[in-house]
Amino acid sequence: MDTVTSALLTDLYELTMLQAARQAGTASRRSVFEVFTRSLPEGRRYGVLAGTGRVLDAIADFRFDEADLRYLRRTGVLDEETLAHLADYRFTGDVHGYEEGELFFPNSPVMRLEGTFEDAVMLETVILSILNHDSGVASVGSRMITAARGRPCIEMGGRRVHEDAAIAAARAAYIVGFASTSNLAAGAHYRVPAAGTSAHAFTLLFDSEEEAFRAQIASQGVGTTLLVDTYDVDAAVRLAVEIAGPELGAVRLDSGDLGAQSIRVRALLDSLGATSTRITATGDLDEFRVEELAQAPLDGYGIGTRLVTGGGHPAPGFVYKLVEREGADGQMHPVGKRSQDKATLGAGKRAFRMLVGDRAHAELVLPGEAEIAEFQRELTAELISAEASPEWRRTNLRPLQVPMIRGGEPVQSLRAPQQVEAARARHAASFAELALDVEDGPDGPIAIPTVTDGIEAARVLR
């Protein structure tokens, strides 16, 4: 498919809403949109926000060029006045949001857009497309890193998704702690370390496994990783050490009972003097399989399909909702759906992570200035109360939303690799605040509650 502008990465109804609002005289009303998810997938204790940097780039590039306008004119859906407006469109509003790599929970307002209705409504699809995909990968990837317990993980799922999604997935995986990627485009654009040596096809190309191993070592050196399960694993390990010597970098297992094989291979390597040779496991791994292999003598994992497809939950269910807008009286009013199972809390919100010492205790999502003021009054009352627990003395609030765009201009301009490194650091710091017990396994209850009431928020530690 030919390259398309980010402006066409949208749904038609964004433009039909825009046209109808312009015709009704309401398109210029000041509006606040928020991105959030109503729930986490069952068993997920937290989510990880990824894709923010890509969203900011998409907003900056959101333009309708002449080819776009010709196509839209051919559809016959939009009138000439609307098309003329689209020709000059530039986002001129404000964006606040959670930093990329930050954790999120149900109802966390991970991104807030403020501007006119016509300014913000068109961005819904592209924002959700990026955040849902990248956060889906990051959320499961973080679980995999936890299950790996410090063993390095390589992202290697590029052959399982769309070519552009593969690059985004590698980026998201690196943010949550993956050590490297097999994807060269991610390495070139985002400076994610690239890794890879050979597949079974390389061994099968030669008349014997010995010829294949000798060719790879001659090209890559003795520190390379040899794939040893094409034929007979034990024979391949002996052959690998015979050719490379005890300084052989690593062997890779890609099939069979990885746990049992790794025990046998480790013993064999040690008996041959290759005590520093590492063992890497690949082959349809996910966080549950990695957890099962925790006691196996493995040194790292290569993870593909289950990572880049979100591990059974490809999207965290982010939605983009109008929560506040200007009325005919010129004042801002909270708005929200009341429908069953999809009700939304009106008003633009402020979010804080409540910490006791350095440990996360609650997600505070407070709607409107009145709710924030009420929380501050109640918090003060609690602090001076005779019933205040010692924990209160160690309590602080970490603001979660930061300005990203003001008046259509980026607040901070970072190159793509800098964005990714900053997000990687943010994720590591935020995850550490949860202080999860790795022995509990991947699944469990949501790590901290989301509190949306000022009085309840001030009393959550009592």
Task: Locate predicted features.
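A residue-level signal for beta-strand positions that form part of recognition/binding surfaces
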Residues: 32-34, 92, 153, 319, ...
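Extended boundary segments
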Residues: 20-78, 146
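Contiguous mid-protein beta-loop-alpha structural module that forms a pocket-lining wall or clamp
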Residues: 280
